[in-house]
Amino acid sequence: MLKFTAEHEWLKFEGDIATVGITSHAAEQLGDLVFVELPEVGATFAKDGDAATVESVKAASDVYCPLDGEVVEINQAIVDDPSLVNSDPQGAGWFFKLKLSNAADAETLLDEAAYKELIA
């Protein structure tokens, strides 16, 4: 199941674990990324908490935690090579995996059609 947020993040769910990243739209708006800072494994966040930071040649932006949960894995590859986020934002450019406090909260997120309408 793939869901989206109004803050341009995507979540792919596998049970109570969500892989989180920024959308292709967000990556295009930011331009070429030069720096990514990710949360530490074990960090817990409330929905909309500042979970990560990205910097591009144009701007710096926070990446928010889309749901309450605990970070169980990070993608070190994008720290080492931020351009992965630009080249494959909804694949190899994922940010972190989140163990959800309440998996039912996923129902509050946007589906793909609603997200496409938001960015149209």
Curated annotation (Swiss-Prot):
Signal peptide positions are none
Q: Which CDD domains match?
A: GCS_H
GO BP annotations, alphabetical order:
glycine decarboxylation via glycine cleavage system
Pull one GO CC term from this UniProt entry: cytoplasm
Cofactor binding comment, as recorded: Binds 1 lipoyl cofactor covalently.
Query: Where does the Lipoyl-binding domain start and stop, copy by copy?
Result: 17-99
Swiss-Prot/TrEMBL keywords = Lipoyl
Tell me the protein family, please. Answer: Belongs to the GcvH family.
**Functional description taken from the UniProt entry:** The glycine cleavage system catalyzes the degradation of glycine. The H protein shuttles the methylamine group of glycine from the P protein to the T protein.
Q: How does it assemble?
A: The glycine cleavage system is composed of four proteins: P, T, L and H.
Q: What is this protein called?
A: Glycine cleavage system H protein
Q: What is the lineage of its organism?
A: Bacteria, Pseudomonadati, Pseudomonadota, Alphaproteobacteria, Hyphomicrobiales
Gene from which this protein is expressed: gcvH
